[in-house]
């Protein structure tokens, strides 16, 4: 049976993640409070940020930026799209 949680991002009951997707205390917080659906939304948003800002994941500043954006997206005020960004669907 799938574990269910009240997702902090979605504000409703949803399927939980099967494993902690991030190391440390933050990963534990994500595992306990963020749904699979919200995590997938973050992964899509993260991909857009990496591409639009041309981030290199070997750069510690880029990783720090993405971690802060992840916290904002999942738990806080949200993460803004880059200025001038338009999706292919628009």
UniProtKB/Swiss-Prot annotation:
Enumerate the UniProt keywords alphabetically.
Answer: Iron
Q: Which GO terms describe its molecular function?
A: iron ion binding
InterPro entries, alphabetized: Fe_traffick_prot_YggX (IPR007457), Fe_traffick_prot_YggX_sf (IPR036766)
Q: Which SUPFAM superfamilies match?
A: YggX-like (SSF111148)
Pfam families, per the entry: Iron_traffic
The alphabetized list of GO BP terms reads: cellular response to oxidative stress
> What are its GO cellular component terms?
cytosol
* Purpose of the protein: Could be a mediator in iron transactions between iron acquisition and iron-requiring processes, such as synthesis and/or repair of Fe-S clusters in biosynthetic enzymes.
Q: Cross-referenced HAMAP family, in alphabetical order?
A: Fe_traffic_YggX
The UniProt similarity line reads: Belongs to the Fe(2+)-trafficking protein family.
Q: NCBIfam families given for it?
A: PRK05408.1 (NF003817)
Q: What is this protein called?
A: Probable Fe(2+)-trafficking protein
């Amino acid at each position: 049976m799938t574990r269910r949680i009240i997702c902090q991002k979605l504000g409703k009951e949803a399927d939980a993640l099967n494993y902690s997707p991030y190391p440390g205390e933050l990963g534990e917080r994500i595992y306990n409070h963020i749904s699979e659906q919200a995590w997938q939304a973050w992964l899509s948003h993260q991909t857009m940020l990496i591409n639009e800002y041309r981030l290199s994941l070997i750069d510690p500043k880029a990783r720090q930026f993405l971690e802060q954006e992840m916290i904002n997206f999942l738990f806080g005020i949200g993460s803004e799209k880059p200025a001038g960004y338009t999706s292919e669907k628009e």
